[in-house]
Amino acid sequence: MLVLAKSSWVRAFFGVVVFCAAAGDVARADQAKTGSQQQPAADAPAAAPAPDKSGYTLFNPTPDSQLRSFAPDRPPKADSATTVDAGHFQYETDLLNYSQTNFGGVTTRLYQAFDPVWKLGLTNWVDFELQFNGYQNLTATDNATGAAVAKASGFGDVFVKSKINLFGNDGGSAALAIIPYVKIPSDAPTISNGVVEGGLIAPFQLQLPHDFGLTLMSEVDALKDAADSGRHANFVDLVNLNHAVPGIKNLSAAIEFFSSVGTDPNTPPIYTFDTALIYLLTPNVQLDAGADFGLNRAAPAVQVFVGLSQRF
């Protein structure tokens, strides 16, 4: 049954990718017909046209001189709306991640090291992504007695994704993408729930005045119920605001409000306030660090991390 479930999830995943790719073609065709979203005033100087990158593919890579600005998904929970350029490879990873949750009379501590996301640009507007949840060590302790409630260690789940940009990949003040995904469970008890899950993510980015960047993201997931083998819908929404740090070149900061609310009565909602610092070491290497803070009991009280991203 698990093999059949995995097969159906994979077929559904690639079906969504094909559908979204077709939608992206329609959106780009409409944009080409109508021109830019806002026509310049008659006396405004004409902007240089963006280079045509539509012909670049995995086997005909985008030249380095035409690469878009480096935009990893990390460090916040929000995903970027732009894809990896065709024929280029990118990885993003936590170097170390620690979280602590106090809920239901139990304190849970989780350490995680190296959870890489590998990305490969397939076309100018589609990339393929594999996310490996790294090695995790979990301990849960009863607050009243100090006794260990649970201990577990092992490697986490694998997420298979495809990011499809609908518009804004190569210029403009707005960008939108859709990201279908499937989760393939690991065999680590407690670390993984052992069930194939999936969903669809939609990040929207907007460039605001005074160099502020805004990301609005919504996500819908089909997840396993906490108490049985049933399924429920889960809804993720977040707002992310970022800006360069004045006086420090290549350093920016981000804040984010995150919510995850499902229809399973045994799965509590999660609300967090997230912060991050991002330093662009080179045009293709990014370092980051951050701290997330729980806004309700079920959320991790604190989560801290440092990470690295690089493009080739």
Residue locations for each model-derived region?
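Sec/Tat signal peptide C-region and signal peptidase I cleavage site
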Residues: 25-29
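Bacterial N-terminal signal peptides
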Residues: 11-22
